[in-house]
From Swiss-Prot:
Annotated InterPro entries: eIF6 (IPR002769)
Keyword Cytoplasm: yes
Protein name according to UniProt: Eukaryotic translation initiation factor 6
The keyword Isomerase belongs to this UniProt entry's keyword annotation: no
One record GO biological process: maturation of LSU-rRNA
Family assignment from sequence similarity: Belongs to the eIF-6 family.
Length: 245
């Protein structure tokens, strides 16, 4: 299922939300309508938590996470950290990191198994990332852009890349991530994919300007038409067994 939403008339909803398979963070402030869209789709399966990071509402660009953990920049306050620890499932590890590239969501893209990171990301951050999120880490660019977290979105089912990504890069990234990838846009032609949408294994949210053509590409590559939460555990088990055999 792919749903359209906006945050205070802003269609860059990927800036104001962070969605994974075990939790969803939504920025404080904004209209109730924005939360109700997320809560309507998610509240029966995962917690939808109001949060800020370092006093900012652009939480989607500030943090990076998956079902195993959440990484936030060092300027996240103790109160914000405690609130997230209290609100998220106990299985989710939350870690503050000292990183020069502090908008972690712009420089890291990940699913539950693999992370793509900015070529200049600190080595220590890379190690923490691999440990906290339990992912394999690759330094990459997308369409020659270093902000890998901004120019793609991917789940354990598929991924959407910057429209100028070459076929060779698509094939390389697809083999690293082990999921099908396509190039595309959101919000009627925006190349900044991750700012315009958030996605997990059964649900996607896109900016209100996203066209029906863009939505159908998203529903197709992320396999959302036949996905619902109860099938996720089964498919996760299958993929885990595949990776072990």
């Amino acid at each position: 299922m792919a749903v359209r939403a906006s945050f205070e008339n802003n269609n860059e909803i990927g800036c104001f939300a962070k969605l994974t398979n075990t939790y969803c963070l939504v920025a404080i402030g904004g209209s109730e309508n924005f939360y109700s869209v997320f809560e309507g789709e998610l509240s029966e399966t995962i917690p939808v938590v109001h949060a800020s990071i370092a006093g900012c509402r652009i939480i989607g660009r500030m943090c990076v996470g998956n079902r195993h953990g959440l990484m936030v920049p060092n300027n996240t306050t103790d109160q914000e950290l405690q609130h997230m620890r209290n609100s998220l499932p106990d299985s989710v590890r939350i870690q503050r990191v000292e990183e020069r590239l502090s908008a972690l969501g712009n420089v890291i893209a990940c699913n539950d198994y693999v992370a793509l990171v900015h070529p200049d990301l600190d080595r220590e951050t890379e190690e923490i990332l691999a440990d906290v999120l339990k992912v394999e880490v690759f330094r990459q660019t997308i369409a020659e852009q270093v902000l890998v977290g901004s120019y793609c979105a991917f789940s354990n089912q598929g991924g959407l890349l910057h429209p100028k990504t070459s076929i060779e890069d698509q094939d390389e990234l697809s083999s690293l991530l082990q999921v099908p990838l396509v190039t595309g846009t959101v919000n009627r032609g925006s190349e900044v994919i991750a700012a315009g949408m958030v996605v997990n294994d059964w649900c996607a949210f896109c900016g209100l300007d996203t066209t029906s053509t863009e939505l159908s590409v998203i529903e197709s590559v992320f396999k959302l038409s036949d996905a619902h939460p109860s099938t996720i555990a089964t498919s996760m088990r299958d993929s885990l067994i595949d990776s072990l055999t």
